[in-house]
């Protein structure tokens, strides 16, 4: 019985490379000269510290562009919390999304069941296993999942016949 897994994973090495490239661009840009802007990752959190809102939005745009250049999905950048740091500085913490949450997996499962395809979806922790009788059904399920606007990056792994 053909099957595949639906997961949401991020490559932390590529994220580190994207952050390093973004930092390099920030240090070379004229509008960031003397602004002492920092960008760093600890575990699953990216922290941006800069002077004002304009520079913060610029750093976010630079970070997203470097994510795209490194073939990382910008949807992996989750919640963005902005707060005051010491002095006139602003700190933003961005959580990285990894794994499919329970409510999102239930939404995917219900969409698959409502599509009337002859496939089954099972929730295994923070990933989904999709089983079906035909390979074509599984490929149409992949297309259905990609077309859903769930707000997280998904990958399809372990495709077996």
Task: Place the predicted regions along the sequence by residue.
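N-terminal intrinsically disordered, cationic/polar leader segments
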Residues: 1-13, 17-21, 25-108, 114-115, ...
């Amino acid at each position: 019985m053909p099957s595949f897994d639906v997961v949401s994973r991020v490559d932390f090495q590529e994220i580190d490379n994207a952050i390093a490239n973004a930092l390099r661009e920030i240090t070379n840009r004229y509008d960031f000269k003397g602004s002492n802007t920092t960008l760093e990752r600890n575990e699953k959190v990216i922290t941006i510290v800069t002077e004002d809102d304009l520079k913060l939005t610029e750093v976010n745009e630079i970070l997203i562009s470097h994510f795209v250049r490194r073939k990382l999905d910008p949807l992996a950048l989750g919640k963005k919390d902005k707060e005051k740091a010491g002095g006139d500085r602003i700190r933003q913490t961005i959580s990285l999304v990894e794994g499919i949450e329970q409510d999102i997996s239930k939404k995917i499962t219900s969409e698959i069941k409502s599509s009337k395809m002859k496939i089954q979806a099972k929730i295994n922790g923070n990933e989904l296993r999709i089983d079906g009788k035909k390979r074509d059904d599984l490929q149409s399920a992949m297309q259905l999942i990609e077309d859903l606007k769930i707000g997280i990056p998904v990958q399809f792994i372990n495709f077996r016949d």
